[in-house]
UniProtKB/Swiss-Prot annotation:
This is Energy-coupling factor transporter ATP-binding protein EcfA1. GO terms for cellular component: ATP-binding cassette (ABC) transporter complex. It holds the Pfam family ABC_tran. It is found in: Cell membrane. Keywords: ATP-binding, Cell membrane, Membrane, Nucleotide-binding, Translocase, Transport. Belongs to the ABC transporter superfamily. Energy-coupling factor EcfA family. SUPFAM superfamilies: P-loop containing nucleoside triphosphate hydrolases. GO terms for molecular function: ATP binding; ATP hydrolysis activity; ATPase-coupled transmembrane transporter activity. The lineage of its organism: Bacteria, Bacillati, Bacillota, Clostridia, Eubacteriales. Residues 6-245 form the ABC transporter domain. It comes from Clostridium acetobutylicum (strain ATCC 824 / DSM 792 / JCM 1419 / IAM 19013 / LMG 5710 / NBRC 13948 / NRRL B-527 / VKM B-1787 / 2291 / W). ATP binds at G44, R45, N46, G47, S48, G49, K50, S51. SMART domains: AAA. Signal peptide: none annotated. Forms a stable energy-coupling factor (ECF) transporter complex composed of 2 membrane-embedded substrate-binding proteins (S component), 2 ATP-binding proteins (A component) and 2 transmembrane proteins (T component).
Amino acid sequence: MYNKMVECKNVVYQYKNEDESKNTTAVNDVTLEVNEGEFLVILGRNGSGKSTLAKHLNALLVPTDGKVIVEGLDTSNEEDVWTIRSKTGMVFQNPDNQIVATIVEEDVAFGPENLGVKPSEIRERVDNALKSVGMYEYRKHEPHLLSGGQKQRVAIAGVLAMHPKCIVFDESTAMLDPKGREEVVNTIMDLNKNSHITIILITHYMEEAINADRIVVMDKGKVIKSGVPREVFKDVKTMKEIGLDVPQMTELAYELKKEGINVKDDILTIDEMVNELCRLK
């Protein structure tokens, strides 16, 4: 039996248009559970509501209707907001917007200091967080001299130092080059596998979703699909219809099947494709 980390119950979020003539519904009746220790990916094209939903998971936004519960605490209860944010950290798209100090270790210490953690414990938390993301040797560096991937790992360390049980990554690799993206994705997977932190990854990079425990697909504010990566991605037709890609090898399998070549339709990686083609010899 899994413990529930996050529960979204019929969540609706509306905001006024610029002319204030009517409301726009960004999240429309979303019900979703995230289990403790799970690696969940939320996919959707721009405007699908995925980032708006993400901001509900640590009470940056509260629902217009419905409820979001984080480890039993209702995000609409103002008295619980700081507790919720200490349980559920968030890493945003642009690391420059999340880094507040001029030295790496001072930046990582900022969160625990604001939580009132004792100085001796802050030192330990900062060192452990930087080691967890492979940035300990850069602790005395100035953040602006780091690469994009390194900055994002410092931002992750800043969240880790607050000892969250869950981290939401809101398109945190979108502004990175391929090397930086790989660094951050490897860090995310390591935190989930070895530190057992619940991960909620919002992305539009399909390759990042392959290793998830579960994928949720959003379109027009609604959850339209949910399942393990193989289940979700093999439905290439539906994914294309809503403007999303699938992993390259899944698409290749789809095209081969259309040409009458009998390969599996749930292939995700190059190795799987090679093995499948060798089987057909």
